[in-house]
A protein has these predicted regions:
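Iron-associated oxidoreductase/ferritin-like identity signal
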Residues: 2-182
Length: 182
C-alpha cells in the first residue's frame, strides 16, 4: 500500500540524514558517558525494584521515595542521551542487566541504595576528571550538575540510613520521618 511505502521511504531518508550527521562516539569522555547512560538506567530499575519492595511492606512513603528516585535516574539517562545527540554523537541504549529484587526488611534496601550512590559518585567523578584532562569544556560543564546531584544523593541516603538503622525504629516512625523530610 502506498501509505506504508511512503512512511518506510521517509523513515529511511530520515535515518540516512541522521547517520550522515551523527558520528560514532569519538572520545573517552563520550564513551564513559555512554556507559553512564547504562548505569543510570540500571539505577532506575533498581530503585523501582526497591519501591516495589516497600510497597509490599505497606510503606507508602518509602515506596514514593524510591519511585521518585527511579524516575530521576531515568531522567538523568535521557539528559545524557540528549547531550550526546546535541554533540552530534549517535547514542545507543546498552544492554541493561537484571537488578536485585529481594531484600530483607526495611533497612537493607536503603543500605544498598547508599552504597550504590557512592559507586555512581565515583563514576561521575571519573567523567569529570576525563573531561577536564582532555580539555572537553562542554563535557565538564555538563557533568558538573551531576556532581552536585551526587552530593545531595549521598547526604540524603546517609540521613535515611541513619534513621532506618536506629535501634528500635518502627515502620510508623520511619514513614513519619520520610513524610516530614521529603
Amino acid at each position: 500500500d502506498i501509505y506504508k511505502y511512503s512512511l518506510t521511504f521517509l523513515a529511511e531518508r530520515r535515518n540516512a540524514r541522521l547517520d550522515k550527521y551523527m558520528t560514532k562516539i569519538n572520545s573517552e569522555f563520550h564513551k564513559l558517558l555512554q556507559e553512564q547512560i547504562g548505569l543510570e538506567l540500571v539505577s532506575s530499575n533498581q530503585y523501582l525494584a526497591m519501591s516495589i519492595h516497600y510497597d509490599n511492606l505497606d510503606m507508602p512513603q518509602m515506596t514514593d521515595v524510591f519511585k521518585g528516585h527511579a524516575d530521576e535516574e531515568y531522567d538523568h539517562a535521557m539528559q545524557m542521551i540528549h547531550y550526546l545527540q546535541d554533540a552530534g554523537i549517535k547514542p545507543e541504549v546498552p544492554e541493561i542487566p537484571a537488578v536485585r529484587n529481594d531484600f530483607d526488611g526495611f533497612v537493607e534496601p536503603v543500605r544498598v541504595a547508599f552504597e550504590h550512590e557512592q559507586f555512581v559518585t565515583s563514576k561521575i567523578e571519573k567523567l569529570a576528571r576525563v573531561a577536564r584532562d582532555s580539555y572537553d569544556f562542554s563535557g565538564e560543564s555538563f557533568i558538573t550538575k551531576f556532581i552536585d546531584e551526587q552530593v545531595e544523593e549521598e547526604a540524603y541516603f546517609s540521613r535515611l540510613l541513619a534513621i532506618v538503622e536506629e535501634e528500635g525504629a518502627t515502620v510508623f516512625e520511619i514513614e513519619n520521618w520520610v513524610a516530614r523530610e521529603i
